[in-house]
C-alpha cells in the first residue's frame, strides 16, 4: 500500500507499544547518518531492548530473543514463548514447547525496525508465496516481519545493526497491564519527558 509513496528509510513499530525516546533517537540517527541504501545487502537497524525491561508482571510474554555479534550485528532472532519470571530466574519455551534458557540481560526485538525504502520490494515479492503456502481455512497465520528479516540475515541478504537501548518498553499484553501503563505515562509527563498535551504549542 505504501510502495511508491515512501522514498526514503522509515521506521516500523507496533502502534500499541511504548518504546522510549532514546530508541527512537538512535534509529533516527542511524537512518539519517549511517544507513547505506545502495548496499549490496539490505542495511537495516533494530532497537535492541533488554529482556528484563520488556516483561509483564501479569503473565508470560513472547519475545524475539536476539543473538548479536561483537560488532553489534544481528546473528539470529528467535521467537521465544512463555517467558516469565520464576523463583529461580526466567523460564521460557521454544515454538514446540521445549524449555529454553534465556537471560534477563539478553537483547530482544520489540518489532522496532529501521528499514530502507527498497526493502518494500522484498516484502512485495515474498507475499504471494506466503499466501500460496497457507492451508485452507487458515485465518491466523501472519506475514511476520521478524521472520522475513531473520531469513534474509541467514541467507546473507540483509545486515541488521542492533542499537541497544536502556529504555523500558511497556504495552498492554494483559488487561491487568493497563494501569501500570497509565501510571508509567503519567510519570513521564510529571518528569517533563513529555508534555501534557503532546501536540500543543
Predicted segments, located by residue:
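Active-site nucleotide-sugar/metal-binding loop of Leloir-type enzymes
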Residues: 1-9
